[in-house]
């Protein structure tokens, strides 16, 4: 491991006696320490309560659930949130030497939640010579009296400091910003659940440099693109020494949702979100026999006494560890301690070559549970997942794959649809070889397309375009949907013409049924939002001898009344939501029905790629005509659902949250259910229009498993 830090002083070495790892325990605590990192565990709380790097306190004083961690937390008991270890934990200390001769020590927190029998385990391991903690998290359920308990809605570990040491947070190059100051937080104005503005502190560095609004979703990221995230201390509160605290996703095979899954990363807390449905992917059910060990991941702490390394230097140091091959021998050595971890003796590899369609960019190969759409792999709670970028020659390779059957999915920017092959068998100690040709789907001669098939709606207005009003220029979609004004952007609604309109400005990144209110505007708009008009010309040659036409619509995310829960509610009129497409003056629409179990949350949770929904719809070619044609995309007029949420409102001072949830109406195409509350959200993103000479291919859709 590359260290960027100077040696610690001799006086400190004398205090610790040597560079060898040490452990100690009393009736109330366990301590793990090497020559640089020290972790103290509370036996009564089942978690870390003190953490030091080069004698620098990384956590600060404990106050409730702050000043602690990494620790395990979940939304998984019948009533919702629970912190494993808070009832009656037992802690066990491990010590040993791995295959390389390096000493290690570990702590296991073990607890059974009495009302349900859910069994929780959290593991932390410290190796000599490293400045971080390897973590595994386990949940097991073997209660026959209640075979189905609930869904595992959130399962996460948190590094949750309570100190002014940390000055910046970072999840990507465009998601790096100063942390809001204590004064800004004290005077913040709530504009939506988990969303604030700092307009009462206009000189705050976050407000000046990054955005007017702060939400935990601003720093969320897709797992394909995210391997390291965390916080940085610039030395201003630590005598000039810089520090970093990073979650390193060195393995991703025990998460769910594939590379499109996106989640919270850092917001003053450094998260490891093992399971959640924040952006609409499914979550596993906790049923009799559920037994899942997540990990390993690695909380890495760097910089230290005398360090002047920059944020990017410390983050780059952490990124060198974000590799599944890193520390494999160590993980094999501790497998005897970690229930449910799959050692390398039970893993193989996959190598493949895919002949890609013309125009494919950023291709990726994904291995997930056999027989299921890759975003739905949580339907098999024991499933594993892997992916690899495909190079320019079509080659990819994946190592350390758990033995078993897999589905191979290949997708790429610029190509509609996916390549899918089931039955890929991986055997322990063996290499599986794949060679395939991906033929791009087609229903005939493509007449026009609007948008880029990249599983995102970011190319449209207020998507990935960079904010011009702040020096750090974050992508606009990351900031907060209420920062923008539909009525200023589209006073007459959407009226788009193929060939002349600009998708970056003339089409919105989200199709609202109803928009508003926002913090700056109490108005609610629904007359210009629900219908979008797409104009397109056709010539005689386009229509000559054509009998059938096909409209393909691909949505980067869609919101129905079910939000993120996948729960059908018969009392809600829009539990299933219809996006209707009207061709010219035809009275009957083509209907894309978004099921209650396909609903997700994107734009109010600062994302433009969520659970994918698509359909190919045939219609008679005589619905079309020579000259201008009109496609109307129709959402229900002023469609809302009843939600429990903090809703946007015009605010002039600080809003204090009441003890009970606020009830209100929010847009059906702009609302979402989170782990405990609902919030607002988007719907339409990408279109392609095709005409064929004879019979078109069958209708195609991606049903989502419950």
From Swiss-Prot:
EC number of this enzyme: 4.2.2.23
Disulfide bond residue pairs: none
Any one of the GO BP annotations: polysaccharide catabolic process
Recorded GO CC terms: extracellular region
Glycosylated sites: 27, 40, 143, 239, 285, 380, 495, 569, 597, 638
Xref: Pfam families: CBM-like, fn3_3
Chain's role: Pectinolytic enzymes consist of four classes of enzymes: pectin lyase, polygalacturonase, pectin methylesterase and rhamnogalacturonase. Degrades the rhamnogalacturonan I (RG-I) backbone of pectin.
Record's protein name: Probable rhamnogalacturonate lyase B
Name of the encoding gene: rglB
């Amino acid at each position: 491991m590359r260290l960027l830090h100077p040696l610690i002083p001799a006086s400190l070495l004398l205090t610790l006696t040597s560079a060898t790892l040490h452990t100690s325990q009393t009736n109330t605590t366990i301590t793990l320490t090497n020559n640089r990192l020290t972790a103290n565990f509370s036996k009564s709380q089942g978690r870390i309560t003190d953490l030091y790097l080069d004698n620098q306190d990384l956590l600060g004083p404990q106050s409730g659930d702050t000043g602690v961690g990494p620790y395990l937390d979940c939304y998984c008991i019948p009533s919702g949130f629970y912190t494993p270890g808070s009832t009656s934990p037992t802690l066990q200390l491990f010590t040993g030497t791995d295959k390389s001769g390096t000493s290690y020590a570990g702590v296991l927190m073990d607890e059974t939640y009495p009302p349900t029998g859910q069994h929780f385990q959290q593991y932390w391991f410290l190796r000599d010579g490293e400045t971080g903690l390897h973590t595994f998290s386990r949940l097991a359920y073997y209660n026959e009296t209640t075979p189905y308990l609930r869904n595992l809605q959130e399962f996460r570990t948190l590094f949750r400091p309570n100190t002014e040491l940390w000055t910046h947070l970072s999840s990507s190059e465009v998601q790096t910003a100063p942390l809001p100051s204590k004064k800004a937080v004290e005077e913040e104005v709530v504009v939506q659940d988990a969303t604030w503005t700092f307009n009462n502190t206009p000189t705050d560095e976050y407000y000046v440099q990054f955005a007017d609004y702060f939400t935990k979703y601003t720093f969320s990221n897709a797992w394909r693109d995210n391997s390291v995230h965390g916080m940085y201390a610039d030395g201003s509160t630590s005598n000039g020494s810089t520090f970093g605290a990073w979650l390193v996703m060195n393995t991703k095979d025990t998460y769910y949702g594939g590379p499109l899954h996106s989640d919270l990363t850092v917001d003053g807390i450094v998260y490891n979100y093992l399971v959640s449905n924040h952006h609409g992917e499914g979550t596993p059910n906790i049923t009799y026999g559920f037994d899942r060990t997540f990990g390993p991941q690695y909380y890495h702490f760097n910089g230290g006494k005398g360090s002047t390394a920059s944020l990017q230097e410390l983050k780059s140091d952490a990124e060198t560890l974000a590799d599944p091959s890193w520390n494999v021998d160590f993980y094999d050595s501790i497998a005897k301690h970690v229930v449910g971890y799959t050692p390398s003796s039970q893993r193989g590899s996959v190598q493949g070559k895919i002949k890609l369609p013309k125009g494919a960019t950023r291709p990726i190969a994904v291995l997930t549970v056999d027989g299921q759409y890759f975003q739905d792999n949580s339907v098999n709670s024991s499933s594993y997942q892997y992916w690899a970028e495909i190079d320019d020659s079509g080659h990819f390779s994946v190592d350390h794959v758990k033995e078993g059957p897999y589905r191979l999915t290949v997708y790429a920017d610029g190509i509609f649809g996916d390549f899918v092959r089931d039955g890929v068998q991986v055997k322990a100690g063996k290499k599986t070889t794949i060679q395939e040709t991906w033929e791009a789907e087609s229903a005939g001669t493509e007449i026009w397309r609007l948008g880029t098939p990249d599983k995102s709606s970011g190319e449209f207005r207020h998507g990935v375009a960079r904010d011009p009003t702040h020096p750090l220029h974050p992508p606009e979609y990351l900031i907060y949907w209420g920062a923008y004004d539909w009525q200023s952007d589209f006073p007459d609604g959407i009226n788009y013409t193929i060939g002349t309109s600009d998708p970056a400005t003339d089409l919105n990144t989200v199709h609202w049924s109803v928009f508003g209110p926002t913090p700056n505007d109490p108005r609610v708009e629904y007359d210009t939002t629900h219908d979008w008009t797409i104009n397109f010309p056709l010539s005689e040659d386009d229509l000559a001898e054509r009998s059938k036409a096909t409209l393909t619509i691909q949505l980067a995310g869609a919101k129905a009344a079910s939000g993120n829960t996948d729960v059908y509610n018969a009392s809600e009129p829009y539990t299933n939501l219809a996006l209707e497409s009207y061709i010219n003056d035809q009275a009957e629409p083509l209907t894309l029905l978004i099921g209650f179990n396909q609903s997700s949350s994107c734009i109010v949770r600062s994302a433009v790629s969520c659970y994918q929904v698509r359909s190919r719809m045939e219609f008679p070619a005589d619905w079309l005509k020579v000259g201008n044609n009109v496609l109307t995309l129709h959402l229900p007029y002023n469609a809302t659902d009843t939600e429990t949420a903090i809703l946007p409102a015009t605010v002039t001072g600080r809003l204090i949250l009441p003890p009970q949830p606020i009830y209100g109406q929010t847009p059906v195409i702009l609302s979402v259910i989170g782990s405990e509350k609902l919030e607002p959200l988007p719907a339409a993103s990408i279109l392609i229009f095709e005409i064929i000479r004879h019979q078109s291919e069958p209708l195609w859709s991606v049903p989502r498993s419950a």
